[in-house]
């Protein structure tokens, strides 16, 4: 069914009413570019599972899903070399500067802090993501676990060119 579509509400100036009675899931999209800006924010098919949770309650607390668009971010090398340049065979690293993934992690930390400032308890804020968003979830929870209630990582993978180069299975 398409009942999940009825639960999507886009409000860029949102407030959280009764923040102590909410569970926040911050959802991070995947990516089809390694370190460059992207025109799309997310793929609708990714949202189905998370969107179905919006409005449900656990122990009287309502679930809210926050879609965190980070397509506009770009890493230092992405800006310089473009979509495929940094993954060419000649480039060996280490990464000079700040990567898009690092910026995604720090951007999520900022969003978490905004929810805490609104009054949502840290233990009721969960980071989630699919593909590169799942990888960002793992990286954030590894680095800042004390800032969130937990992480839900779906099919975490990113930078397939590197995996292919190093024969990761």
Describe every region a protein language model picked out.
Residues 1-18:
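N-terminal cap/lid segment of alpha/beta-hydrolase-fold proteins
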Residues 22-25, 62, 124:
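Alpha/beta-hydrolase fold active-site loops
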Residues 27-31, 67-71, 128-131, 154-157:
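Active-site-proximal beta-strand/loop segments in catalytic clefts of secreted hydrolases
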Residues 35, 74-77, 157-164:
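A short beta-to-alpha transition loop/helix N-cap that caps and shapes the active-site region
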Residues 58-78, 83:
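Conserved alpha/beta-hydrolase
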Residues 114, 123-168:
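Primarily recognizes the serine-hydrolase "nucleophile elbow" in alpha/beta-hydrolase
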């Amino acid at each position: 069914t398409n009942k999940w579509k009825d639960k999507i509400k886009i409000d860029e100036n949102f407030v959280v009413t009764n923040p102590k009675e909410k569970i926040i899931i911050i959802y991070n999209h995947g990516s089809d570019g390694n370190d460059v800006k992207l025109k799309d924010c997310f793929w609708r098919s990714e949202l189905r599972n998370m969107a179905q949770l919006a409005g449900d309650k656990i122990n009287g607390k309502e679930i809210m899903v926050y879609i965190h668009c980070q397509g506009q971010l770009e890493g230092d090398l992405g800006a310089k070399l473009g979509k495929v340049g940094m993954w060419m065979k000649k480039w060996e690293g280490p990464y000079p500067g700040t990567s898009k993934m690092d910026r995604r992690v720090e951007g999520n930390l900022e969003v978490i802090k905004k929810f805490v400032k609104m009054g949502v308890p840290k233990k009721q804020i969960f980071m989630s993501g699919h593909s590169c968003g799942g990888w960002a979830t793992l990286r954030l929870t590894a680095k800042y676990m004390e800032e969130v209630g937990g992480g839900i990582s779906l099919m975490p993978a990113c930078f397939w060119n590197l995996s292919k180069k190093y024969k990761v299975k």
